């Protein structure tokens, strides 16, 4: 199992790095759109769409929505994402209560649109936008930063959870997660943000805002993970798919990012660090 995970990671890493950091904006949009479309194919299964043709059709609908949003103001979609993730907090908190309201195939399919589409919009808003924070103007580093926030939060949560994780966060959704893990992840994210602020020669005020933005993003990333866990538990499946041998599916790898990316993109836009760009 470990060997399979390593081989898959070694194959995917250069593809991901090349697609994210070396493609022009339109190529980046197509590359990330392909990932989101594959994620939509997986989400169809989590929605209860079983027929292969129907799953493909759902993925194509999501791809069509992405195309239709190419010239729609990104900020409007990002605001929608923020309100959606606030609602998700209530859904996860009440589970299994309330599942009769969102448990239909149609409702879960719509949930997929609300998760996947804003993530793509947020990524491409960052990729095409103008960026300035401290002495940094490289928007590709923003994408790397939000990825790192999620990874740092996961690492901090893992070690804090193992050491102090007695009080469970959402035992009916994800029994392995603990409140200690959440706090440990947030502490790690705060330290990481302070270090990045120093490296970017940011002012004290900018660094403080970065810490706040990163903490909010870290919290929301937990919701992304919990939402997918809730849907898989409701559906009775362990992984979103087996597209990535040893790792499960694409959604199993990007669930936290689907929440973190649009929220972080919105926050830094409101702060004036990120401005709308052109294709």
Residue ranges, per PLM feature:
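Alpha-helical membrane segments and immediately flanking helix-loop junctions
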Residues: 216-224, 231, 247-254
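Membrane-embedded alpha-helical bundles of polytopic integral membrane proteins
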Residues: 2-215
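Divalent-cation-assisted or electrostatically stabilized phosphate/pyrophosphate-binding catalytic cores
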Residues: 176-183, 242-258
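Juxtamembrane boundary at the C-terminal end of a transmembrane helix
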Residues: 266-279
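Interfacial helix-loop-helix junctions of multi-pass membrane proteins
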Residues: 227-243
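Final/C-terminal transmembrane alpha-helix of multipass membrane proteins
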Residues: 253-269
């Amino acid at each position: 199992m470990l060997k399979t995970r390593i081989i898959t990671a070694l194959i995917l890493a250069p593809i991901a790095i090349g697609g994210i950091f070396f493609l022009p904006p339109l190529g980046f949009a197509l590359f990330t759109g392909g990932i989101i479309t594959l994620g939509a194919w997986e989400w169809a299964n989590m929605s209860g769409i079983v027929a292969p043709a129907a799953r493909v059709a759902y993925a194509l609908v999501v791809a069509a929505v992405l195309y239709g949003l190419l010239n729609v103001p990104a900020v409007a979609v990002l605001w929608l994402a923020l309100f959606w993730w606030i609602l998700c907090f209530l859904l996860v908190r009440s589970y299994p209560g309330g599942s009769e309201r969102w448990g239909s195939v149609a409702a879960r399919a719509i949930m997929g649109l609300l998760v996947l589409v804003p993530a793509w919009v947020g990524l491409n808003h960052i990729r095409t936008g103008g960026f300035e924070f401290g002495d940094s103007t490289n928007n590709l580093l923003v994408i790397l930063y939000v990825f790192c926030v999620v990874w740092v939060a996961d690492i901090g949560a893992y070690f804090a959870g193992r050491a102090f994780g007695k009080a469970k966060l959402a035992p009916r959704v994800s029994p392995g997660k603990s409140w200690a893990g959440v706090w440990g992840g947030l502490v790690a994210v705060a330290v990481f943000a302070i270090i990045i602020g120093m490296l970017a020669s940011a002012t004290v005020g900018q660094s403080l805002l970065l810490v706040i933005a990163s903490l909010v993003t870290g919290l929301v990333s937990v919701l992304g993970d919990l939402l997918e866990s809730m849907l898989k538990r409701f559906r009775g499946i362990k992984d979103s798919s087996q597209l990535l041998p040893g790792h499960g599916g694409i959604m199993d790898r990007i669930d936290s990012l689907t929440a973190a990316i649009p929220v972080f993109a919105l926050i830094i836009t409101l702060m004036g660090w990120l401005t709308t760009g052109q294709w």
